[in-house]
Amino acid sequence: MPRSLKKGPFIDAHLFAKVEKAVESNSRKPIKTWSRRSMILPQMVGLTISVHNGRTHVPVIISEQMVGHKLGEFAPTRTYRGHGFDKKAKK
């Protein structure tokens, strides 16, 4: 079930403060965050945010199409190495 419109989008306060500061100072430095649950707001467009995926920080460049999605959607947590293969078929 999606979040109620009257509540508005969720974003962690510490991340919002960093975004406001970066927009105000026109900073190009990536913003490092562990907050995968925060929603992408229109103010973030053009910024680079490094989102933690459990092991490293993945740089995500925010574009117009990402607004309304969560930051965690753009930093995959699992590495897919393909399905198992048959050793006999390889020979």
From Swiss-Prot:
A cellular component annotation (GO) from this entry: cytoplasm
A GO BP entry: translation
Pfam families in the cross-refs: Ribosomal_S19
Record-linked InterPro entries: Ribosomal_uS19 (IPR002222), Ribosomal_uS19_bac-type (IPR005732), Ribosomal_uS19_CS (IPR020934), Ribosomal_uS19_SF (IPR023575)
Superkingdom assignment: Bacteria
Classification via Gene3D superfamilies: 30s Ribosomal Protein S19, Chain A
GO molecular function, one term: structural constituent of ribosome
UniProt KW keywords: Ribonucleoprotein, Ribosomal protein, RNA-binding, rRNA-binding
HAMAP family cross-referenced by the UniProt entry: Ribosomal_uS19
Functional description taken from the UniProt entry: Protein S19 forms a complex with S13 that binds strongly to the 16S ribosomal RNA.
Sequence similarity: Belongs to the universal ribosomal protein uS19 family.
Matching NCBIfam families: rpsS_bact
Protein name: Small ribosomal subunit protein uS19
Gene assigned in the entry: rpsS
